[in-house]
Amino acid sequence: MATDTLTHATAHAHEHGHHDAGGTKIFGFWIYLMSDCILFSILFATYAVLVNGTAGGPTGKDIFELPFVLVETFLLLFSSITYGMAAIAMYKNNKSQVISWLALTWLFGAGFIGMEIYEFHHLIVNGMGPDRSGFLSAFFALVGTHGLHVTSGLIWMAVLMVQIARRGLTSTNRTRIMCLSLFWHFLDVVWICVFTVVYLMGAM
């Protein structure tokens, strides 16, 4: 009886330790996101200062294609929804559904990056690269930094899917899913700001 009680207490303490470690990691990730907020705030401020510095070159109205960017936006928004479904599946302990929803999220994110690469390539080959004007430098810096963050999120997501497939929904993998969720939804919010400030206002 005493042995059973001791075993139960040890297991409870071990589980409690896992929860504490997971909570600490998520808190630490929130701090990282705050630093990312500062980075993007600086990039937005730089863009606001340089937006009229076209040096006689093209303006936002000349280069932005809103229908194209809307498709990009919907891809990223849909990826946020599918990631939410992956989180729900995690709480239901359904490993296969978690992997399936993450894979769909990855495809939406990859589509977004593919369209962004196409947009950048189209601008550069037509002589509208970041060296053309202050406006274009700020544009490429802001949108490109967001794109690099999405790309890193896709790499993280691919690695996470492999880890879940091999080890299941362990407490460590659950913490990773939650941290990536914070990161992914943060990038959605940043993109909505980019879409509004850069593309919508620039196309007016």
UniProtKB/Swiss-Prot annotation:
SUPFAM superfamilies: Cytochrome c oxidase subunit III-like (SSF81452)
Location within or outside the cell: Cell inner membrane
Coiled coil: none
Cellular component, GO annotation: cytochrome o ubiquinol oxidase complex; plasma membrane
UniProt entry keywords in alphabetical sequence: Cell inner membrane, Cell membrane, Electron transport, Membrane, Oxidoreductase, Transmembrane, Transmembrane helix, Transport
Cytoplasmic side: 1-31, 86-101, 162-184
Primary residence: membrane
Residue ranges that the UniProt entry lists as topological domain Periplasmic: 51-66, 121-142, 204
GO MF term list: cytochrome bo3 ubiquinol oxidase activity; cytochrome-c oxidase activity; electron transfer activity; oxidoreduction-driven active transmembrane transporter activity; proton transmembrane transporter activity
Spans traversing the lipid bilayer: 32-50, 67-85, 102-120, 143-161, 185-203
Deletion phenotype: Increased reduction of the ubiquinone pool (in aerobically grown minimal medium with glucose).
Name of a matching Pfam family: COX3
Alphabetical list of InterPro entries matching this protein: Cyt_c/ubiquinol_Oxase_su3 (IPR024791), Cyt_c_oxidase-like_su3 (IPR000298), Cyt_c_oxidase_su3-like_sf (IPR035973), Cyt_c_oxidase_su3_a-hlx (IPR013833), Cyt_c_ubiqinol_oxidase_su3 (IPR014206), Ubiquinol_oxase_su3_dom (IPR033946)
Membrane topology: Multi-pass membrane protein
GO biological process: aerobic electron transport chain; aerobic respiration; electron transport coupled proton transport
Entry-linked CDD domains: Ubiquinol_oxidase_III (cd02863)
PANTHER family in alphabetical order: CYTOCHROME BO(3) UBIQUINOL OXIDASE SUBUNIT 3, CYTOCHROME C OXIDASE SUBUNIT III
Subunit architecture: Heterooctamer of two A chains, two B chains, two C chains and two D chains.
Family membership: Belongs to the cytochrome c oxidase subunit 3 family.
Role this protein plays: Cytochrome bo(3) ubiquinol terminal oxidase is the component of the aerobic respiratory chain of E.coli that predominates when cells are grown at high aeration. Has proton pump activity across the membrane in addition to electron transfer, pumping 2 protons/electron.
Name used for this protein in its record: Cytochrome bo(3) ubiquinol oxidase subunit 3
Record organism: Escherichia coli (strain K12)
Gene name as annotated: cyoC
